[in-house]
Every structure is written in C-alpha cells, then in structure tokens.
Amino acid sequence: MAEIVLNVEVRERTGTGGARDTRRSGMVPGVLYGGDKDPVAIAVRANEFRKALYTGKLLGHLVTLKYGNETQPVIAKAVDMHPVTDEPQHFDLYRVDEHQQIKIEVPVHFTNQDDSPGLKRGGTLNVALHTLTVSCPADSIPEEIVFDLTGLEIGATIRVADLKLPAKAEAAVDGETVVASVAGAMAEVAEEAAEGAEGEAAAEGGEE
C-alpha cells in the first residue's frame, strides 16, 4: 500500500503562465499522465507537497492520488526544483495499477567499505551505476539495492548479476553490466606494472 496520499485539484490553466499562477496561489503544479487516459493538469498545496517530498517516500514510490472521493494509485516520476530556492516547481505523476509490472530506477548503495581489503589498502570504489532499472509490481518497488563490499580486493568488478534483488524485482538491464569496481591507487598500479615488466624481462633472459 502507498504510504503517501496527495490531495490534488484540477488546474484550469495550463502552460507557463498557468503554472506560474498556480505557484503564486500557494500550490505546486503537476501533470497526471499514463494509462489509456489523457494527461490532466493538477496541483497540490505547496506545504502538503513539501511534506510528502521530504519524507523521501515520494519520488519513485507508489503514491495515492486523491481527488474528491476518487483515488488513483500513481508513481511520482519527476519533481523539478527551483535552482536557487530549492522549492518544488513542478511534478509528474504516472497512473498505474497496484499490481501492474513497471520499470523504475532504484538507488544502489554500498556497505562495509571498511571490510574491503582493497579499499583499506588505498583503493577507490568507482561507481558506474548509482541507480538500477528494475522490473517489478508497482506495489513492490524496492527502497534500495544494497551490495556488501566485504572481502573485495583491488581489481574486483561488481556486475548487475552480482546484486541481490528483492523478491518480485528483476534487473531490466544486462547482467554483465558493470555497477562498480575497486581500483588501485596510482602508486600501487605503477608498482604492479613495474613488477610485471621485471618479471617478463627475467623470463625473457632465462629463455636465452
């Protein structure tokens, strides 16, 4: 079930001017789209929208939209913020069925950096994917995907296939896609390269 309920009003005026008037009236303009229905211009009271946004349970989550006595499950797809005031300026909601299979981006987080021998030796975790696109029911969107770095050495590569996804969720990208890697410090890389060159030289000398 959705944790957040947004009480919306339908906007009569659309476009830049309509959105500006909506914000001046203390509301945040938005658009409801998706499904087999036409897009609808909507608005939510600014204080209610900010409260929902700052819970961290709005963007990318299943939300209940309420208009009068009617309700509609939606996914909050995007929120535009003002570059100076950091106030919400506009939002997009996507109509869904609670059990509908959807594709959505989920944040990827890494734990136990201190238990990675490679990182403890000065290595760097190079993250290629900060989010992963998954396919899952709308009412089972994962909060996050967590990868345990325990035991990883320098040179280790983490791929999508290595991630443990929650029940009902499947990766929507190739399993060989690189998520992150543990790279060595430059000095260590240079030292290993030098050792490799010395080993090759010694081997060639032995063959003569």
Curated annotation (Swiss-Prot):
Part of the 50S ribosomal subunit; part of the 5S rRNA/L5/L18/L25 subcomplex. Contacts the 5S rRNA. Binds to the 5S rRNA independently of L5 and L18. This is one of the proteins that binds to the 5S RNA in the ribosome where it forms part of the central protuberance. HAMAP family: Ribosomal_bL25_CTC (MF_01334). One of its GO terms (molecular function) is structural constituent of ribosome. GO terms for cellular component: cytosolic large ribosomal subunit. The lineage of its organism: Bacteria, Pseudomonadati, Pseudomonadota, Alphaproteobacteria, Caulobacterales. NCBIfam families: bL25_bact_ctc, PRK05618.1-2. Keywords: Ribonucleoprotein, Ribosomal protein, RNA-binding, rRNA-binding. Belongs to the bacterial ribosomal protein bL25 family. CTC subfamily. Pfam families: Ribosomal_L25p (PF01386), Ribosomal_TL5_C (PF14693). Signal peptide: none annotated. Gene3D superfamilies: Ribosomal protein L25, beta domain (2.170.120.20), Ribosomal Protein L25, Chain P (2.40.240.10). It comes from the Bacteria. This is Large ribosomal subunit protein bL25. GO terms for biological process: translation. InterPro entries: Rbsml_bL25/Gln-tRNA_synth_N (IPR020056), Ribosomal_bL25/Gln-tRNA_synth (IPR011035), Ribosomal_bL25_b-dom (IPR020057), Ribosomal_bL25_C (IPR037121), Ribosomal_bL25_long (IPR001021), Ribosomal_L25_dom (IPR029751), Ribosomal_uL5_bac-type (IPR020930). The keyword Nucleotidyltransferase does not apply.
